[in-house]
Each structure stands twice: as C-alpha cells, then as structure tokens.
Amino acid sequence: ELSMWLPEQLGSSVNHQGDQPKEQDVVLYGFGRIGRLLARILLERSSSPLGSGLNLRAVVVRKNGDKDLVKRASLLERDSVHGPFKGVIEVDEENSTIIANGVPVRFIYSSDPTTVDYTEYGIKDALLVDNTGRWRDVPGLEQHLNCPGISRVLLTAPGKGDMKNIVFGVNDNVITDEDKIVSAASCTTNAITPALKVLDDAYGVERGHVETVHAFTNDQNLIDNFHKGDRRGRSAVLNMVITETGAAKAVSKALPQLEGKLTGNAIRVPTPDVSMAILNVKLTKPAGSAEELNELFRRESIDGELRRQVGYSDSPEAVSTDFVGSRTAGVVDSLATVVTDDSAIVYVWYDNEFGYSCQVIRVLERMGGYDVPSYPAK
C-alpha cells in the first residue's frame, strides 16, 4: 500500500532527475520591515543545498549617513521580533556590499529610480520588488522598467487601477509572461482571501464583514504627533486605534465573485507583529456546525490546494506570539469558530510581516518561472 501511496502523493517528482532551477536576478527596492524579511528568506534559500533559482543581487536605498551600510547590516542581522539572522553577515564598505552566508549583495544608493543602471553591476533581466509603497500605480512603477537590467516589477502593496493583485494560491494562475508589473496585494488580503475561498467553494458567501485586529506598523506614531490619517497620529503603543482597511474590498480582485459582498474595518493594537482577521459571513448553504466547518479547514491545511496559505490551530493556549514566523498566509483558530444557521464567524491569525513575505516570495517564484515542489502533489 505504501508503495502505491507515495508515488501518488509525490506526483511527477518520482523518478524525475530534475533540472537546475533557472537563475533569476532579484533586486529589492527598499529595505524596511518587508524588504529585510524578503532578504532573509532569499538568502536562507540561496545557502541551502537545493538553492532557489532566485538570486538576491542588490538592494536600492537612500543613503543615511556615513555608517549607513553598517547599520543596515545590523538591522538585517538583528530583529526584535523575528530574532537573529541564521548565519554570518559581513560588511564590505569599500564595495558597498553586505555578504550574508557567503552571498554578496550590492547596496545601491539612489533616491530616483530612473537614475540606476543595473547592468553596471552585472545585473540583467532582473525581477525588482518595490517594497517602499511610494508608487502603487503602473505609471509610477514603470520607472523601474526604464532602467537597464530590470525586466519585471512586483509591488508589495495593493496595486491601483487595472494592475493584477495576486494572492498566491488563489489567483496566481492569471500571471502571464506579458505581465511586467503585478501586485502581491496586502498582508490582510493575503490572510483572508484563502479562507474566504474555502468558505465560498464549500458553502457560497452571500455577504460578510471583515474586522482586522492589526499590529501597529511604522506608519503610526510612537507618541502623539501629527499624522495626515485620522486617529493614526495617536500613540501606537498606548492605544487601540480604529482605522480603515481596503483589504475586504480588495478580495474581489482575487475572487471576482465576491465583489460588493464584503465590508471591512481595522483596529490597530499595541503589539509589534501578528494580527487577526475576524470573518463574519452569511453563507448560501448552512455549514451545519462549527465542527463541520473546522473539519473543512483542517483538511485544507493538511492536503488541500491552499495548504500553504491556510493553517489550522486547535490549541486552547494559542496566543498571538505563537504565530510569529508562521509561513502560511493565515491560521484558522478553530476553537473560536462560531456557526449559527447560515452564519459563520471564523478567526484567522496571521503574521502580517513574515507570513506575508512568504506569500510575496511565492509570487516572485511564479514570475521567475520557478515553483518550489510541495507535497502532497496537486
């Protein structure tokens, strides 16, 4: 029985010699919270025996003083939330290079994306990940494509206009070779869309409301000060802050059948990482019971097509910090599930930094034509 079951689960990988992954240059434009986590993941994979096919070649930032490179290396090496970098980091200031686990990463200083010629650094046909959030439309992001050495751009924020917003596992199949600029949507959209797809596929979603209890971000103030956004000027570490979120409406860019069916709000809370989305939905077909609904999510997390996006927790002791470093887009907390007639309330934990970064990497791999094998095979 085992001899029959294993080939079925491993799919085409059985007896397949495999080709070396295509080498794909990657450039990070920006080096904030998401940029550094993307760098960590890419460097972690580069130093593994299997490699990844994605080579982090350069990071573009604005220079902040003489010790800029040393400080950025320190931020990559030490993280108050995600812990120390797994490996060795060296700094070559003379060549503006950080060497991580033997992998050299060139730091290019520029405040204008149109002024960089990446081919001068031996970079060609690169995928550029813009994680600054400064430009979110095609005209703004096209500036990168005008630079020699850049072939495609991935935005780590919700894209505006007709730009494709990709939630890996849900609609990454719509990416084509002709797409020069795509968006990886937001952390919250990535967390809730897979769970909503599971619900919609099984029961149908007529309407719903999404409430996100979100960790504070760099966009908020440490102490009370001016902020152009309502309420966000108040101290992030002392207050719960009601604010807006476009995540619920953005779901329809990945699941068009849910357009106009979802509303959403957000509450920023005094925690540095890991957030929770509460999905309150009316179903077309009643779920029957919380146990039935939980079993649906449990099975999906084990061998469903969305198993890399949907996690499952049944621990009565789980709290937010337990999900720091979670590689899934979201984790359903089964003990909080509520089902009443045709209504369901589902609680989804998500690491809004690392979990989202893993989703971004998956989109990057798809754009580069490289998909990491996962098992069971689907």
Model features per residue range: what roles?
Residues 1, 324-378:
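NAD(P)-dependent Rossmann-like dehydrogenase/reductase catalytic/cofactor-binding core
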Residues 1-222, 227-230, 338, 360-363, ...:
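N-terminal Rossmann-like NAD(P) cofactor-binding subdomain of oxidoreductases
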Residues 23-30, 181-183, 277-284, 344-350:
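Short glycine-rich or small-residue beta-strand-to-loop segments that form or flank ligand, phosphate
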Residues 44, 201, 253, 257, ...:
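Short, well-ordered loop/turn and helix-capping segments at boundaries between secondary-structure elements
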Residues 49-117, 207, 212-344:
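C-terminal substrate-binding/catalytic lobe of Rossmann-fold NAD(P)-dependent oxidoreductases
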Residues 136, 162, 247, 289, ...:
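Short phosphate-engaging motifs
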Residues 190, 285-288, 355:
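A generic structural signal for alpha-helix starts
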